[in-house]
A protein has these predicted regions:
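Short, surface-exposed loop/turn segments at secondary-structure boundaries that line and modulate
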Residues: 25, 185-188
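An anion/pyrophosphate-binding glycine-rich loop and adjacent beta-alpha core
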Residues: 14-141
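Hydrophobic or amphipathic alpha-helical targeting/insertion segments
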Residues: 4-13
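Single conserved hydrophobic/aromatic residue that forms the stacking wall/gate
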Residues: 188-198
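A glycine-rich dinucleotide-binding beta-alpha-beta segment and adjacent secondary-structure elements
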Residues: 131-185
Length: 198
């Protein structure tokens, strides 16, 4: 009961690190001015998808009509060792930066392509659908395009507001005997205690 409805904080537990937000690089970008939020897609898509943009600024060409030599696989180019599997913050920053330079696609130029075609050719459509079936169906329902035929449009969006109860190295709050675990911690998405502040 103590953990519900901000109970620990109301009882004097210190709160820490509320100023950080985790950004998720694979969200469905806005489709119009009336869209109030971006839809989160799974990061697992970057395991099999290649992220790219047209090399031409403000390209209005359909992605399937853009030849390979006119595509910029910017994460693979900038980070050849990691490619599309760079950390979330890096993928998010690079996508935003390149879109701000005018290379973005879709509504307001706020999108990049996540293309599954190479993985479909390599592993087969059946394997890709087995891995991502629910995500592919959700994307098609929202966007109206089959992501196994047309590259997905993605863009970074806020995912997780960090901050929570302050803990010491033993994961105990400033309330004697109150230990804090999981996402109630004043940390990032993982359980790792913060440094004590004196």
């Amino acid at each position: 009961m103590l953990l519900q409805f901000g109970g620990p904080h109301k009882r004097g537990a210190n709160f820490a690190n509320p100023s950080f937000t985790q950004i998720h690089p694979t969200c469905i970008p806005p489709g119009g001015i009336y869209q109030s939020k971006l839809t989160l897609m799974s990061e697992s898509l970057r395991n099999d998808g290649r992220i790219w943009l047209p090399k031409k600024i403000d390209s209005k060409d359909d992605p399937e009509n853009i030849p390979e030599h006119e595509r910029d696989y910017f994460l693979e180019r900038q980070y050849p060792k990691y490619g599309n599997l760079v950390p979330r913050d890096v993928a998010s920053r690079r996508a935003r930066e390149i879109c701000e330079k005018g290379f973005g696609i879709g509504f307001g130029g706020k999108g990049v392509y996540l293309d599954l075609q190479d993985s479909i050719k390599k592993d087969g459509l059946k394997v890709i659908k087995a891995k991502y079936g629910n995500l592919l169906e959700m994307y098609e329902r929202i966007v109206g395009e089959d992501p196994t035929k047309v590259p997905m449009k993605i863009y970074p969006a806020p995912h997780y507001t960090m901050g929570g109860l302050w803990v010491d190295y033993n994961l105990m709050s400033n309330i004697d005997g109150l230990f804090v675990l999981g996402e109630a911690l004043s940390l990032i998405h993982i359980s790792e205690p913060t440094r004590q502040h004196h």
